[in-house]
Swiss-Prot record:
GO molecular function: actin binding; small GTPase binding
Pro residues biased stretches: 526-535, 551-574, 581-597
Name this polypeptide is given: Formin-like protein 2
Family per similarity comment: Belongs to the formin homology family.
One GO BP: cortical actin cytoskeleton organization
Domain FH2: 615-1006
Sites of N-myristoyl glycine lipidation: G2
Keyword Heme in annotation: no
Positions where Phosphoserine occurs in the chain: S188
Entry keyword annotation includes Phosphoprotein: yes
Length: 1086
């Protein structure tokens, strides 16, 4: 059917007809065939066709019957013949009056057929045979001819101004002589064809004007526009109308019709065409033609005149204002937009809109406000531009200030980092001193405890001695024992028998220290032990000093045998030394000097952070290639970079280098170089010189020597005395690639022993001869490279070590971070306790999982929740990340490589010292060692502190320092802080959005309550509209709705214009290209 989107309305129209008796349903096969024919005739989109195919047979048969009853009986040529009959100028006026009475009805039937018939009928109407569009446009021109030219005002001069021999249609054709629109291809006829088709129009144009005046009093113009609108609703018809040289012009001329309803219809149609890509230019061209035909002084003059005069017809005023809004503000070029705006300003639009600002029509007020909202105030724009220029200057000034402040901040950060490192050093030193003091205190405390124990034991011994003495005296008084002194100073305790005689057999010898024997007893069980003598003065004195052992203590063990001869290293003395095996020998120290020349590859370069670099073979190209001016890394800079892991030579094997050379070779070159012939020529040319080096190596050496601009003597002398002023370090590193190999040295020495003339050698060979004679060449070149790069290496390594130290200390000492981890641990245990049980800690990589754990509604993550908890409950730790200093810098440091670089520097320094001991007269080495040994020592101290500080903080967080380098440890905190800040921002944004939405809802509720009191139905309708608008804003946002390339697009645009009240236009208006296949139209509503 005609309109692809009007299936339901068509079915309603079908039911409106008088339905005769229902015919019997045919067989299913025949039913499906006829249903397929009906579907093809209806020209429905695929989705609606699929819907109809799902009908049961009963509904399909009803649809077939309705469709067949609805078929238009008149073919297209019937209407075309009737319209041509009205246009025949040979018919008499009386006969014309009789014919034209049914013209409006014929046009109405034609409009219904164009709108409701299948696409085949419309294509037949428009084909080359019928040329229905041409006939319809000609009839429209004829119907409004009298109104357009106002023949009443020019009737008196018609004889002199109108050529009687020219038909009315040809005079209309002349109006479009200046049209530059492209002629339709296959859809319309040329000017000469049009003239030949109208050859029968031979009556004077006076009668034509009178007939046109008669037709203009009817609704024929309005219905003609409806017919053209129905044609334009098809892709095929729309393309024909757009490419027709006069169709749009005639539609625009219809604005002269006196019926405001017709004029509103015309403006709606023209506004819809404006929204099609390329349509705006066609509409402006039509109004240029309107200006010429109607004699306007300015374009749109008649339109503004009708807009002012038809103030009693709101629909026309809304259509006019909407058309003005679209034609002015739907332009891509801003200057052209201002130009169109000024056209209407000159016609008095601004003043008239000021009068209409209090109009009672809401629709008109919306369009007026839309125009005013989109107006460009050039003066204000100029002022804004000037303000912008001033602002840009201010911005530039502020950016410069920011740049200076950034430099100062960087310097301040470096100074602060250095101070932090120094304080950390002092702290570590104080901690070491504290550990020593604690050890001394521990030892002293142990000694004090031992002495107190000894004093206590001595006091107990004295007490026992006093007790024993008392008992001995008592026994002596009782006569039980008798004390007898001997000549040697000992005393004897003799028991007294019952008969009063002494028993000599039981005599006890007691020495000077008898009093100190606590367990001494007599032979008789009833006799108490004799009391000892008082201690001598020596014993008392020793006891007072607290150094003597307790009396009668067991004798000390015999002294250990002398230790065996100590093997290196010697064992510990004592029994442990005798039993424990000797420790293994220490590993041999690293070699103190690199191998001598000839024992290793000449590509080895000894320097900070520099590993063995493989020499890349030079590539011989067939053509001269342009130079790629990249910034190359030095050999000592590729260690640890991505370039250390890639092999470009392998890539070249996969590429088509011949094609590459052909594409990028330099201009003005002959054919490709034959490598074999070129080698022969070189050999012939250099036959007078003897070349001992390999050709490519000699060539590269020559290039390197030319860069230096020094003679061989100067270079060798500078190497001998380590003169880096004469030979820059870059040249030294380049020259190290050409250290003579063992084979080259043999060849050179052989040539020299044979006493061949050196003059026959090439410059490169003579240089290599002299170069190879330098003593310890490899060591000297290595030392020069080391000295030249030492300062740069120190400056590169020191900030990295400082960053590790500062970041480690700040993370370990941050109490706020500790609180954050405590919160995370608590929430994690709460979530996992029912399944996995509580834990006591977690790995740091678990922090990355906070973003993966989402809430039930998927709107926030666990990290968002933690951010909210911290802000609400623990505000004191909200800015915990401010306590983490230099973490990002530390994350970029490879501590392992830095420590290796420090070791390499130490090896280089040792090599330099050894060289200086051999040649202590070299002032350059002396000054270098004097000024830089301290720097290296300080760097080594920083490296030790950095290693210790990092190990401490890694262990502090439960990680293993061996498996967790800084490049893994610190980025965890960097990512966590970044994600935490983003979560804070998103929480704040969501809070603002919820607050704004709540305020909006409260306002809407208050407004709806007011409207509810007035009109409940209005409240319901408004709620629905706001809900739809909100859904569109959320889902579509700034994307414009795109009308698909299908039939019915024009109707969709016009419907959108009526419903949506387009009020906003983008700066760059998007239209759809007009193509002969699929024109797509966009709605501009934002």
């Amino acid at each position: 059917m005609g309109n692809a989107g009007s299936m339901d309305s068509q079915q309603t129209d079908f039911k409106a007809h008088n339905v005769p008796l229902k015919l019997p349903m045919p067989e299913p096969g025949e039913l499906e065939e006829r249903f397929a024919i009906v579907l093809n005739a209806m020209n429905l989109p695929p989705d609606k066709a699929r819907l109809l195919r799902q009908y049961d047979n009963e509904k399909k048969w009803e649809l077939i019957c309705d469709q067949e009853r609805f078929q238009v009986k008149n073919p297209p040529h019937t209407y075309i013949q009737k319209l041509k009959g009205y246009l025949d100028p040979a018919v008499t006026r009386k006969k014309f009056r009789r014919r034209v009475q049914e013209s409006t009805q014929v046009l109405r039937e034609l409009e219904i057929s164009l709108r409701t018939n299948h696409i085949g009928w419309v294509r037949e109407f428009l084909n080359e045979e019928n040329k229905g569009l041409d006939v319809l446009v000609e009839y429209l021109s004829f119907a409004q001819y009298a109104v357009t030219f106002d023949f009443e005002s020019v009737e008196s001069t018609m004889e002199s101004t109108v050529d009687k021999s020219k038909p009315w249609s040809r005079s209309i054709e002349d109006l479009h002589r200046g049209s530059n629109l492209p002629s339709p291809v296959g859809n319309s006829v040329s000017r000469s064809g049009r003239h030949s088709a109208l050859r029968y129009n031979t009556l004077p144009s006076r009668r034509t004007l009178k007939n046109s005046r008669l037709v203009s009093k009817k609704d024929d113009v309005h219905v003609c526009i409806m017919c053209l609108r129905a044609i334009m609703n098809y892709q095929y018809g729309f393309n024909m109308v757009m490419s027709h040289p006069h169709a749009v012009n005639e539609i625009a001329l219809s604005l002269n019709n006196k019926n405001p309803r017709t004029k509103a219809l015309v403006l709606e149609l023209l506004a819809a065409v404006c929204l099609v890509r390329g349509g705006h230019e066609i509409i402006l061209s039509a109004f240029d033609n309107f200006k010429e035909v109607c004699g306007e002084k300015q374009r749109f003059e008649k339109l503004m005149e009708h807009f002012r005069n038809e103030d009693n017809n709101i629909d026309f005023m809304v259509a006019s204002m909407q058309f003005i809004n679209i034609v002015v503000h739907s332009v891509e070029d801003m200057n052209f937009r201002v130009h169109l705006q000024y056209e209407f300003t000159k016609l008095g639009l601004d003043e008239y809109l000021d009068k209409l600002k209090h109009t009672e029509s809401d629709k008109l007020q919306v369009q007026i406000q839309a125009y005013l909202d989109n107006v460009f105030d050039v003066g204000a724009l100029l002022e804004d531009a000037e303000t912008k220029n001033a602002a840009l200057e201010r911005v530039e000034e502020l950016e410069e200030n920011i740049s200076h402040l950034s430099e100062k901040l960087q310097d301040t950060e470096n100074e602060a980092m250095s101070k932090i490192v120094e304080l950390e050093k002092q702290l570590m030193q104080r901690n070491k001193e504290l550990d020593v003091v604690r050890e001394i205190y521990k030892d002293a405390n142990t000694q004090v405890h031992t002495l107190r124990k000894m004093v206590k034991e001595k006091e107990e011994a004295i007490q026992r001695q006093s007790t024993l003495e008392k008992k001995i005296h008592e026994l002596e008084k009782q006569g039980t024992i008798k004390i007898q002194k001997k000549g040697d100073g000992d005393i004897a305790i003799l028991p007294v028998m019952a008969s009063g005689t002494l028993s000599t057999g039981s005599e006890l010898a007691v020495g000077n220290y008898v009093g100190s024997v606590p367990g001494a007893t007599t032979s008789g069980p009833s006799v108490p032990p004799p009391p000892p003598l008082p201690p001598s003065s020596d014993t008392s004195e020793a006891a007072q000093n607290g150094t003597a052992s307790p009396p009668m203590s067991p004798p000390p063990p015999p002294p250990p045998p002398p230790p065996p001869p100590p093997p290196p290293p010697p064992p510990l003395p004592g029994p442990a030394a005798e039993t424990s095996p000797a420790p293994p020998l220490p590993p041999p120290p690293p070699p103190s000097a690199p191998p001598l020349p000839g024992t290793s590859s000449p590509t080895v370069v000894f320097n900070s952070g520099l590993a063995a670099v493989k020499i890349k073979k030079p590539i011989k190209t067939k053509f001269r290639m342009p130079v790629f001016n990249w910034v190359a890394l030095k050999p000592n800079q590729i260690n640890g970079t991505v370039f250390n892991e890639i092999d470009d030579e392998r890539i070249l094997e996969d590429l088509n280098v011949d094609e590459f050379e052909e594409i990028f070779k330099t201009k003005a070159q002959g054919p490709a170089i034959d490598l074999s012939s070129s080698k022969q020529k070189i050999t012939q040319k250099a036959s007078s010189k003897v070349t001992l080096l390999e050709a490519n190596r000699a060539k590269n050496l020559a290039i390197t020597l030319r860069k230096a601009g020094k003679s061989a003597d100067e270079i060798c002398k500078a190497i001998h005395v380590f003169d880096l002023k004469t030979l820059p370090v870059d040249f030294v590193e380049c020259l190290m690639r050409f250290l003579p190999t063992e084979n080259e040295v043999k060849v050179l020495r052989l040539y020299e022993r044979e006493r061949k003339p050196l003059e026959n050698l090439s410059d490169e060979d003579r240089f290599m001869m002299q170069f190879s004679k330098i003593e310890r060449l490899l060591q000297k070149m290595t030392i020069m490279a080391f000295i030249g790069n030492f300062t740069e290496s120190i400056q590169m390594l020191t900030p990295q070590l400082h960053a590790i130290i500062a970041a480690s200390v700040s993370i370990k000492s941050s109490q706020k971070l500790k609180k954050i981890l405590e919160i995370i641990l608590a929430l994690g245990n709460y979530m996992n306790s029912s399944k996995r049980g509580a834990v006591y800690g977690f790995k740091l990589q678990s922090l990355d999982l906070l973003l993966d754990t989402k809430s039930t509604d998927r709107k926030q993550t666990l990290l968002h929740y933690i951010s909210n908890v911290v802000k609400e409950k623990y505000q004191q730790v909200t800015l915990f990340y401010n306590e983490l200093h230099y973490v990002e810098k530390a994350a970029a440091v490879s501590l392992e490589n830095v420590l290796l670089d420090v070791k390499e520097l130490q090896r280089g320094m040792d090599l330099t010292k050894r060289e200086y001991t051999m040649h202590d007269h070299n002032t350059l080495l002396k000054e270098f060692l004097l000024h830089n040994e301290g720097k290296l020592k300080k760097l080594q101290e920083d490296a030790k502190i950095a290693q210790d500080a990092f190990d401490d903080v890694v262990k502090y967080f439960g990680e293993n320092p061996k498996t967790t380098p800084p490049s893994v440890f610190f980025p965890v905190f960097v990512r966590f802080v970044k994600a935490y800040k983003q979560a804070e921002e998103e929480n704040e944004l969501r809070k603002k959005q919820e607050q704004a939405l709540m305020e909006k809802l409260l306002e809407q509720e208050a407004l709806m309550e007011q409207q509810d009191a007035k009109s409940p139905s209005h409240k319901s309708k408004r709620q629905q509209q706001e809900l739809i608008a909100e859904l569109r804003r959320r889902q579509v946002k700034d994307n414009r709705h795109v009308y698909e390339g299908k039939d019915g697009a024009i109707e969709d645009i016009i419907t959108a214009l009526k419903k949506n009240n387009i009020t906003k236009f983008p700066n760059v208006h998007s239209r759809v290209r007009i193509s002969s296949s699929t024109p797509v139209v966009e709605d501009t509503q934002s």
